[in-house]
A protein has these predicted regions:
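Short Gly/aromatic-enriched secondary-structure transition segments
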Residues: 13, 25-26
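Short, surface-exposed coil-to-beta transition loops
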Residues: 59-63
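Arg/Lys-rich, positively charged N-terminal/basic patches that mediate binding to nucleic acids
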Residues: 1-20
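Enriched for short, Lys/Arg-rich terminal
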Residues: 67-102
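Residues that recognize and position ribonucleotide moieties
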Residues: 2, 46, 86
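Short polar/acidic secondary-structure junctions
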Residues: 53-55, 66-69
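Sequence/structural signature of beta-propeller domains
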Residues: 8, 19-20, 24, 31, ...
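A short, surface-exposed loop/turn module that caps and links secondary-structure elements
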Residues: 27-57
């Protein structure tokens, strides 16, 4: 599985996960690329709950990604703490779709 990151994701992941935690996330997604729930109206963009440092999945991180099934690739789009926001706004979803050209 090939992982491609947006610049925003790269900036945020370095602040929210250490190398081992990020490797564990990538391993999980490589084994279970459909693990995240598809965000309605997103064209297939998924949201995965992920435990952050010292937190469980429910209060941890939200990983936003897109699984390119035919390309065996995952685009890592956005990452945020649940305490920052519950869900992506419709505008955020629209921008992510445009970035992927879906």
């Amino acid at each position: 599985m090939i992982f491609v990151e947006t610049p925003t994701f790269t900036k945020r992941v370095t602040n929210l996960l250490d190398d081992d935690e990020y490797r564990a996330l990538q391993t999980h997604l490589a084994r279970h690329p459909a693990a995240g729930k598809v965000i309605p109206g997103s064209g297939g963009i998924r949201k995965l709950r992920w435990a952050g440092r010292g937190r469980g999945k429910r209060s941890g991180l939200r990983v936003i990604y897109y699984w390119w099934v035919t390309k065996d690739r995952i685009s890592m789009l956005f990452l945020y703490r649940k305490s920052e926001q519950d869900d992506l706004t419709p505008q955020q979803v629209k921008l992510l779709r445009q970035a992927l050209e879906l």
